[in-house]
């Protein structure tokens, strides 16, 4: 693990959701399902299963179960995995990571299997300081343990870190851990019922850098 002298203007560590904050997995899910409506229904059922399953169950198993539950054929999960290495990167994501690299350690905390999570993380072309998947943590977000594992591996308290979410459900977990959170709400989802309000929210990534560099963003 690399050791980086912290910049006074930034937190020591910035953690990211991967599949919705940095990568456009929506497009691949929708394509595998055959339409946006079918893809959203499939994704919603998958999320329901992950948030209710407790200890980790294989990601691929939950994806298949969700497809069956909403009436999709077995070819849909197969198409999703076939398109995995073509997950689009959101515009501005690589530029943001490059701008942060001199100032912060960077990590990913993702609801995914180890196999697919590390493959997806590699698409950004970043030398990540930590990549934590739900399989490695033993639980799916928003359980606190995946975020806590990433912070522990970087030997950094939550007070000296920040999180960039792609889902409003991350806010439940980051609040418990004490991570300041920017919600990159690219597709305009409603805040989940009962979820804490994020420190900042935008449909774009351009606001992340000034938010992190703002006075008071770094630990005192």
Feature map (PLM): residue ranges:
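Short, acidic loop-to-helix structural element flanking the phosphoryl-transfer center
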Residues: 59-64, 77-108, 118, 122, ...
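Short glycine/proline-enriched coil/turn segments at helix->beta-strand junctions
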Residues: 34-38, 71-76, 101-104, 125-127, ...
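Alpha-helical elements of Rossmann-like donor-binding domains used by nucleotide-donor carbohydrate transfer enzymes
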Residues: 28-32, 41, 65-66, 79, ...
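Alpha-helix C-terminal capping segments
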Residues: 27-36, 66-71, 97-101, 120-124, ...
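Tryptophan-centric aromatic hotspots in well-structured domains and transmembrane helices
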Residues: 25-29, 87-90, 128, 183
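Asp-based, Mg2+/Mn2+-dependent phosphohydrolase catalytic module
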Residues: 1-14, 98, 109-220
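Active-site neighborhood of HAD-like aspartate-dependent phosphohydrolases
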Residues: 2-47, 71-72
């Amino acid at each position: 693990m690399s050791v980086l002298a912290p910049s006074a203007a930034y937190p020591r560590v910035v953690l990211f959701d991967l599949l919705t904050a940095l990568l456009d997995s929506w497009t691949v899910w929708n394509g595998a399902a055959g339409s946006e409506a079918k893809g959203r229904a499939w994704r919603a059922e998958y999320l329901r299963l992950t948030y209710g399953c407790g200890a980790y169950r294989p990601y691929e198993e939950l994806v298949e179960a969700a497809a069956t539950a909403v009436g999709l054929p077995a070819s849909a999960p197969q198409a999703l995995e076939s398109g995995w290495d073509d997950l689009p990167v959101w515009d501005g994501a690589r530029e943001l990571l490059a701008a942060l690299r001199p100032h912060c350690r960077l990590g990913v905390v993702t609801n995914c299997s180890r196999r697919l999570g590390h493959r997806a993380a590699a698409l950004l072309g970043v030398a990540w300081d930590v990549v934590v998947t739900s399989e490695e943590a033993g639980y799916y977000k928003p359980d606190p343990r995946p975020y806590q594992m990433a912070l522990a591996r970087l030997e950094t308290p939550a007070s000296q870190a920040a999180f960039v979410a792609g889902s409003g459900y991350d806010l439940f977990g980051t609040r418990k851990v004490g991570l300041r959170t920017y919600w990159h709400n690219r597709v305009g989802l409603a805040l989940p019922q009962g979820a804490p309000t994020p420190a900042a929210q935008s449909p774009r990534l351009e606001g992340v850098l000034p938010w992190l560099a703002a006075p008071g963003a770094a630990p005192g």
